[in-house]
Amino acid sequence: MGSKPPRTGIRPCRLPKSQRALLLVDFITTLDFPGGDKLAGPALAAARAAAALKQRLHADGVIAIYANDNYGVWQSDFHSLVSTCLGLEGPAGEIVRVLYPQADDLTILKPRHSAFYASPLELLLTEMETRELVICGLATDMCVQLTAADAFLREYRVWVPSDCTAAESESARAGALDYMARVLKCDVRPSTEPAPGPVSAGG
């Protein structure tokens, strides 16, 4: 009979049920990539708006999920990335301080642009019985749009608050928001307006 594996001290936790979930895409970033300097200012503004929205939604029992790129480093973990970005000066460090993850927030790492692709997100949302997504993050015309597209294909109801996303140019952001509204049927009202009402039991 084999020996028992050593105790890790990690206890499984029961996932909360949350019909609506807040998905924060790629806000935790060094901004150290081509175009990062153009994204920095708008990203910080989007992070501040997303932080205010997160606080309001948390009061309503909405769970926040951070979905962040692993940057191709398969040994990486989310909290190490947070620690790295906290030590940075400028917008990258300020974004992390504004949107610093809380104890009851959930986190996943993603290997590609969409938060759904090759990640545990879909299983996580199923376990939480989530039917509506509020998608905020970077960049509007890349990871946010592709995540919204995958959510649309999976028949989630999606709200992409226009002031809680950022792109390298205003035209890129506006074009992506228009596409998500027209083609992906996303609500793109800003976070300063009342949130969309909950989806009915019949869908």
Set out the residue ranges of the language-model regions.
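Short, basic, glycine/proline-bearing loop/turn elements
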Residues: 36-39, 79-82, 133
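Short acidic, Gly/Ser-rich segments with clustered Asp/Glu that frequently serve as metal-coordination loops
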Residues: 28-33
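Generic enzyme active-site microenvironment
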Residues: 24, 67, 161
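A generic "binding-loop/recognition-motif" signal
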Residues: 27, 70, 140
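Short acidic, gly/pro-rich beta-turn/loop elements at beta-sheet edges
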Residues: 35, 77, 118
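Active-site-adjacent betaalpha module
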Residues: 1-21, 52-60, 84-203
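Early exported N-terminus immediately downstream of N-terminal targeting peptides
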Residues: 63-64, 68-83
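A short alpha/beta connector and helix-capping loop motif
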Residues: 18, 36-68
